[in-house]
Amino acid sequence: MINGSTKIVGLIGHPVEHSFSPPMHNAAFEELGLDYAYVPFNVCPENLKSAILGAKSLNIKGFNVTIPHKINVMKYLDKLDPIAKLIGAVNTIDFKEMKGYNTDGIGCIKAIGEVTSIKDKNIVVAGAGGASRAISFYLARENPQSIHILNRDINKAKSLAEDLKNSKLTDNVDFDSIDKIVGYVSDADILIDTTPVGMSPHVNDEAIVKAEDMHSDLVVNDIVYNPNETVLLSEAIKAGATPVYGIKMLLYQGAESFEIWTGEKAPVDVMEKTLRKTLDL
């Protein structure tokens, strides 16, 4: 029951109607008996500054931040987590310190961590947008053998690769056209697809790599979670490769935000169960 002592956290974006975060977080608060409530707020870009200042005045404890505010919100914060600063985007705010974090990348690392480690692995990242950027900086921190950024717009891939090198987190990064992905996948340990290929409603898109071009030791992560089994993961299963589902990244980035706000260990099993129920899985 919400009362005068309930701590409010939430989501700001535009739009936010279809977010799966509220049920996941509210189930976690209930599981741990925490007097918190998670509420989505639809904030238009022109109202972002007043929303952040108003939230602080209202003693809101934290926000998740989604499109289109992840970059613009940074200018209204007092502090940035070092890796969020490198990524150049924030998806979590802790109002206690007016500090921004980016938990997208750690969500991906933990999802893959269920089946293998990043250390000393050859990794192919498809795409060079915001999600790729967040994930690539976290990958670089885990000491992989190599990171190959492949993108349709090769200049975007080059820019991300250069930023990774300049961060001093890794030297072992290069870039190329996504058209050459088959050659890279043959030597890869992990393939991460950050592109929207196969995302609902375009579930019949052609997979960026076919089963015949994969090998059985490959770990394949698609960050798309709707549908659960994307065209790429379907090909991975056909090839005997290990699939890592997009729902796991959604789960772990949420768990990381939960821990930043509450200081408590997230009940990941309850959060996953709720997420699966919400997604009808």
UniProtKB/Swiss-Prot annotation:
Keyword Oxidoreductase: yes
Pathway annotation: Metabolic intermediate biosynthesis; chorismate biosynthesis; chorismate from D-erythrose 4-phosphate and phosphoenolpyruvate: step 4/7
Gene Ontology MF terms in the entry: NADP binding; shikimate 3-dehydrogenase (NADP+) activity
A GO biological-process term: aromatic amino acid family biosynthetic process
Segment forming the signal sequence: none
Catalytic activity, EC: 1.1.1.25
Catalyzed chemical reaction(s): shikimate + NADP(+) = 3-dehydroshikimate + NADPH + H(+)
Keywords: Amino-acid biosynthesis, Aromatic amino acid biosynthesis, NADP, Oxidoreductase
Binding site for shikimate: 19-21, 66, 91, 104, 225
Keyword NAD: no
Active-site annotation: 70
Matches recorded under NCBIfam families: aroE, PRK00258.2-2, PRK00258.3-3
Assembly with partners or alone: Homodimer.
Family label: Belongs to the shikimate dehydrogenase family.
Reported function: Involved in the biosynthesis of the chorismate, which leads to the biosynthesis of aromatic amino acids. Catalyzes the reversible NADPH linked reduction of 3-dehydroshikimate (DHSA) to yield shikimate (SA).
Protein name from the UniProt record: Shikimate dehydrogenase (NADP(+))
Organism from which the protein derives: Methanobrevibacter smithii (strain ATCC 35061 / DSM 861 / OCM 144 / PS)
